[in-house]
Amino acid sequence: MEMAPAAQVASNPRTVEDIFKDYSARRGALVRALTSDVDEFFGLCDPDKENLCLYGLANGSWEVALPAEEVPPELPEPALGINFARDGMNRRDWLSLVAVHSDSWLVSVAFFFAARLNGNERKRLFNMINDLPTVYEALVDRKHVRDRSGVDSSGKSKHSTKRTGEGQVKRSRVVAEEYEDDDEEHNETFCGTCGGLYNANEFWIGCDICERWFHGKCVRITPAKAEHIKHYKCPDCSSSSSKKTRL
């Protein structure tokens, strides 16, 4: 099957908040491609195909595709030919290389949109971006994340507050085993908004509709507020319900 060029149609965000939302969606997509969806991603990067790129899209999805045909392209392009090195490198090293290039691309797209912002706005955007873990950190810096999560050196798991589907608050574990093979890398929990890895020191809340998990701060829910919510519905599910109601 021939692979078509990526359709990089941008939503053209203009404000700091909208650009950051675009960045977060693309970043979350790339994190998923290199972690929970890594087997699918690996299979799509066939070295026998032409120059392929990994795209994180503004709608939160990802795709492996040929580069855009327009010159110059509508948006900055990600690294070309990521598929060629797939079988010539250690799998973990190859994924790390793709992650580093993906981080560079994400920043270039964000500041492409930020070209008309003033200096203070660009600085604020950069700080917002810098507050999120990079794709590379989400992929390989797991020991650092576990250390920040309060996991002790004995390898025992620590607990933090998460919410169940019944609106109750429960204690859930962050497993602290070393990631000795690639298969174990797929078991991480990522925030449905920012794509950040689970951290036991932060409050998380689960959506009862789509069953995704979110940083409380990303969806503006505090532990105290969560205690009074019987069934939590994330912003995406709330938006979908509103649209159906209006129809």
From Swiss-Prot:
InterPro entries for the chain: Alfin (IPR045104), Alfin_N (IPR021998), PHD_AL_plant (IPR044104), Zinc_finger_PHD-type_CS (IPR019786), Znf_FYVE_PHD (IPR011011), Znf_PHD (IPR001965), Znf_PHD-finger (IPR019787), Znf_RING/FYVE/PHD (IPR013083)
Quaternary assembly: Interacts with H3K4me3 and to a lesser extent with H3K4me2.
Keywords annotated in UniProt: Chromatin regulator, Metal-binding, Nucleus, Transcription, Transcription regulation, Zinc, Zinc-finger
Zinc finger intervals, PHD-type: 188-240
Name used for this protein in its record: PHD finger protein ALFIN-LIKE 3
Domain comment in the entry: The PHD-type zinc finger mediates the binding to H3K4me3.
Site residues by UniProt (Histone H3K4me3 binding): 198, 204, 208, 213
GO molecular function, one term: transcription cis-regulatory region binding
Biological function: Histone-binding component that specifically recognizes H3 tails trimethylated on 'Lys-4' (H3K4me3), which mark transcription start sites of virtually all active genes.
Family, per entry: Belongs to the Alfin family.
KW Phosphoprotein (keyword) present: no
Subcellular location: Nucleus
Pfam families: Alfin, PHD
A cellular-component GO term for this protein: nucleus
Zinc-finger keyword on record: yes
BP terms from Gene Ontology: chromatin organization; regulation of DNA-templated transcription
Annotated stretches, region: Disordered: 147-178
